[in-house]
C-alpha cells in the first residue's frame, strides 16, 4: 500500500494512526508539507497512492474539483477523522468520486482511535462505526448506569489504548476499573454503530 498523509505529524492522527500503521505494515507513506487540493491529487497520481488519511476540510475542497473520480481511480481507501464529516459532504463526495469515505472517532488520550466504520464494514453518513478489537465502550446516563438501547449516553472507554493520566501527576485518567470518559455523548443504532450527538464537557 501507498498512503498519502497531508496531516501534521505533531497530531496523533498522523503520527500513530497513519505513520505508525504504515511502519507496522511495511507500507509506503507520501508526505506533503501542507494540503493543496490540486497538488495533493497530483501526488496521488504520481506516487500511485492507494490509501488516503484525511480530515473533513480535505474532502470538502476535493468535492469542488472536476474529474475527481478519475483522479482517485487508483485509491482503494479514503479515511476521515479529527472532526465530524458533514453528511452532505460524504454523500456528495461518494457521488462525485464513486467511492465512500470511512470515518472514525478517537482522541489523543486513546492512542487515538476508539471506533471506526471500517470495523462495522459499512460507511454510514453521520456515524463513526464500532469499537476496535480490544476496546470496550459503554454509554451511561447521569447516574452512571448503562442507557437503554437507542438512548443517548456519555461515552466510557476501556482498553490497553487508554492513557494513564495527564502529565505530570497522572491526573484525570481512567477510574479504578480502567474506564475513561472522553466527555462525548452518543447513541448506538440497531446495527451497533455509534453516532456522536453532544459534548458533555471539555477535558482541558
Q: Model-found features: residue ranges?
A:
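Conserved AMP-binding/adenylation subdomain of ANL enzymes
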Residues: 1-2, 10-51, 65
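Conserved AMP-binding
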Residues: 7-11, 83
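Gly/Ser/Thr-rich phosphate-binding loop
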Residues: 24, 46-54, 63-123, 136
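Short, P/G- and charge-enriched loop/turn segments at secondary-structure junctions
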Residues: 121-127, 173-175
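Active-site glycine-centered loops adjacent to acidic/histidine catalytic or metal-binding residues
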Residues: 82, 106, 129, 184, ...
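Alpha-helix capping/helix-boundary segments
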Residues: 36, 57-59, 85, 162
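Conserved ATP-binding/catalytic segment of the ANL
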Residues: 145-150, 154-204
Amino acid at each position: 500500500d501507498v498512503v498519502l498523509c497531508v496531516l501534521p505529524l505533531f497530531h496523533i492522527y498522523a503520527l500513530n494512526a497513519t505513520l505508525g500503521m504504515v511502519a507496522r505494515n511495511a507500507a509506503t507513506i507520501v508526505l506533503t508539507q501542507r494540503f493543496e487540493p490540486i497538488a495533493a491529487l497530483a501526488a496521488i497520481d504520481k506516487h500511485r497512492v492507494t490509501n488516503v488519511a484525511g480530515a473533513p476540510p480535505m474532502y470538502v475542497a476535493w468535492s469542488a474539483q472536476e474529474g475527481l473520480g478519475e483522479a482517485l481511480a487508483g485509491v482503494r481507501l479514503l479515511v476521515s477523522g479529527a472532526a465530524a464529516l458533514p453528511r452532505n459532504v460524504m454523500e456528495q463526495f461518494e457521488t462525485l468520486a464513486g467511492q465512500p469515505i470511512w470515518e472514525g472517532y478517537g482522541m489523543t488520550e486513546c492512542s487515538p482511535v476508539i471506533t471506526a466504520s471500517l470495523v462495522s464494514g459499512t460507511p454510514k453518513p453521520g456515524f463513526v462505526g464500532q469499537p476496535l478489537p480490544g476496546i470496550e465502550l459503554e454509554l451511561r446516563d447521569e447516574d452512571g448506569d448503562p442507557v437503554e438501547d437507542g438512548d443517548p449516553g456519555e461515552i466510557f472507554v476501556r482498553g490497553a489504548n487508554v492513557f494513564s493520566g495527564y502529565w505530570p501527576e497522572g491526573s484525570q485518567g481512567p477510574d479504578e476499573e480502567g474506564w475513561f470518559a472522553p466527555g462525548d455523548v452518543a447513541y448506538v443504532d440497531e446495527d451497533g454503530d455509534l453516532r456522536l450527538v453532544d459534548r458533555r464537557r471539555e477535558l482541558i
